[in-house]
Amino acid sequence: MRQYSVPARFSVDERDNVAAMVFEHERDDPDHIIYQRQIDGIWTDITCAEAARHIRSAALGLIALGVQAGDRVSIFSATCYEWAILDLAILAVGAVTVPIYETSSAEQVRWVLQNSEAVLAFAETDAHAAMIAELTGDLPALRRVLVINGSGPKALEQLAEEGGSVDRAELTARLDALRSSDPATLIYTSGTTGRPKGCQLTHSNLLHEIRGTQECLPTLLTPGQRLLVFLPLAHVLARALTLSAFASKVTVGFTSDIKNLLPLFAVFKPTVVVSVPRVFEKVYNTAEQNASNDGKGAIFKLAAQTAVDWSRAWDDGRPGLLLRAKHALFDRLVYHKLRAALGGDCHAAVSGGAPLGARLGHFYRGVGLTIYEGYGLTETSAAVTVNQIDALKIGTVGKLVPGNSLRIADDGELLVRGGVVFSGYWRNEQATDEAFTDGWFRTGDLGAIDDDGFLSITGRKKELIVTAGGKNVAPAVLEDQLRAHPLISQAMVVGDAKPFIGALITIDPEAFGGWKQRNSKADHAAVRDLAEDPDLVAEVDAAVKEANLAVSHAESIRKFRILHVDFTEDTGELTPTMKVKRNVVAEKFSVEIEAIYTKD
């Protein structure tokens, strides 16, 4: 069993807590612009002093409402300025933030609020509040629901009014009583299989994440940088990086308006973004599709290959004269347009949650956007490894965040321990016992470390497919390759206890229209009408053959089915971070899976 450790050059003391930085910034740099928030569509500056005032006001309101240290308080909302303020206010009074994705179903909301025994909930809209109201009979601990942005009084205004009579000394006493070992947040896993479990993270866990990522990404996490957060703050990656940015006095903006990101980029002009790989895949695929629709597909493919070659050349030394000339040409024709679409100043991104893929990483670096890919789980407070400013290897998930250790078991499973690793699942001793071996957290992921200390994720242990012939196949390699094709939205590899590997494939609805036009298909034709069309099947078959080049013959996809519908979060096949719920898909499309193994 191989073991690796990176010591921390920082410390987390017993009396440290996450909320203290709010009031340190207020004291040391009150006029620094720490946030920008949208007010009536206009980005408005929020200084450290103003943010602290809002957080203090909300915290005093929580005290007035009877929230005690250790109480669970839920935020059921999309990403917004108020989310960040409420989170820090909850932490400041010693309570525990319980995030809920704004897209969660009533049953998911019921489970989280009931299991956590939340005493107070913040609902983003009237509709979110109404959903909770329908569940109150099952939620005896829940005392009140405040609405962040509804038709009635706003939550922050209500808290300010409630807390107006509370002495500031009460908040000071709460802060003084906090210990780094105290719980800070209870985050429920997104649940690709089974019922979500509550991961308890302490102030110490979050501070190790904040300070560790500051060491790894010092030039990104520094005053003067501008971070646009559009991932759900209920996701540990977005939350942790937002806290790291706040600690580093990066100016942070929030939006949940994913459909209108490009106009927001143009106005906010981020220097850094945080996202999951599917977003980077979609940006690339959309650019390729648009170029193809305009008759410039060949130019884009040449430009993309040149960007990849350029990035790889820097790993090997430096680009040659011809490659530099090609890169300069495509920079004028293609790359500058992509950078402009991101606001013109964006030079870096942080990616996690799923594998990015080496080709995509090289493409973006060749265009001028370096993606620092990391690896982690909710149970590790987000990143436990990450590519770093002075240690970057595209195609890997980087090196250990300082203050942590990593083991690779004999079967390839990654085991971790250290400052970012959680202490256990909320009120679930059995799951906690199963998750740890001799103090090491079993991630369930498979990986390998190269001679330079960079980690690569090779698959998910629970997702390993064992064919009838006994071949172990990690589906992620094939699925990532397939999703890289602009026409493919999602792919799920199947074949457990079957004679060969197959795949279910969905078509990207945004790319489908352009494909129909280029291939002289009827505009009104749906995927179900063309699922067996020879041209569509041939296009997908080419993508499958390309993906198969990444694996051995025994692991390759022999047959596939094009599904009539795409996977979505609304219809239950995807988690909020766009991971496929394999058990849901297997059950819902069992007939299609069996058809793969039926002789034609």
Swiss-Prot record:
GO molecular function terms listed in the Swiss-Prot or TrEMBL record: ATP binding; long-chain fatty acid-CoA ligase activity
Coiled-coil residue spans: none
Keyword Lipid metabolism (UniProt): yes
Keywords of this entry: ATP-binding, Fatty acid metabolism, Ligase, Lipid metabolism, Nucleotide-binding
Pathway this chain belongs to: Lipid metabolism; fatty acid biosynthesis
Short name of any one Pfam family annotated for the protein: AMP-binding
Reactions the enzyme catalyzes: a long-chain fatty acid + ATP + CoA = a long-chain fatty acyl-CoA + AMP + diphosphate
Any GO CC annotation of this UniProt entry: membrane
GO terms for biological process, alphabetical: fatty acid biosynthetic process
SUPFAM superfamilies: Acetyl-CoA synthetase-like
EC identifiers of the protein: 6.2.1.3
Function: Catalyzes the activation of long-chain fatty acids as acyl-coenzyme A (acyl-CoA), which are then transferred to the multifunctional polyketide synthase (PKS) type III for further chain extension.
PANTHER family assigned to the protein according to its UniProt record, in alphabetical order: AMP-DEPENDENT SYNTHETASE_LIGASE DOMAIN-CONTAINING PROTEIN (PTHR43272:SF32), LONG-CHAIN-FATTY-ACID--COA LIGASE (PTHR43272)
Family: Belongs to the ATP-dependent AMP-binding enzyme family.
Name under which the protein is recorded: Long-chain-fatty-acid--CoA ligase FadD15
Organism for this UniProt entry: Mycobacterium marinum (strain ATCC BAA-535 / M)
